[in-house]
């Protein structure tokens, strides 16, 4: 049984609202996946904060129209699955990449980031982006390194002086 017009409009509005706020998107063909595998993928998407939706191609084109993911419409054919990253730019790509390791039936069509369309070969690059927490910790470590070096150098001067004086004292006592 097909979707009613109202259901289609609601789906387009829902996907459009998510696409408007999303950072990245991945489109994939799910042909060959069982219902159980799709359930696993959906559960993993919920855990990772990724919006995952099976959408008819025409509805998907309408949903992404006017968003930065409009560039993906050429790849909307066949059984289509859309994954949007809400908070972490690499989340959708990591989800699809990790799921593909176990299920080769999932075929990546396109990856979009910042209004630019990338091919499926860029999935790993997008998936390797650090999470927000990882990026912040790297930034903090980078900012902390010069200050820590300065503190170490500043503390080393008095220590070196004390060691030099101790060596002179030991030399005088020995003489």
Curated annotation (Swiss-Prot):
Pfam family, one: Ribosomal_L10
GO biological process: translation
GO MF term list: large ribosomal subunit rRNA binding; structural constituent of ribosome
UniProt keyword Metal-binding present: no
Entries under HAMAP family matching the protein: Ribosomal_uL10 (MF_00362)
The protein's role, per its UniProt record: Forms part of the ribosomal stalk, playing a central role in the interaction of the ribosome with GTP-bound translation factors.
Protein name as catalogued: Large ribosomal subunit protein uL10
UniProt organism field: Halorhodospira halophila (strain DSM 244 / SL1)
This protein's encoding gene: rplJ
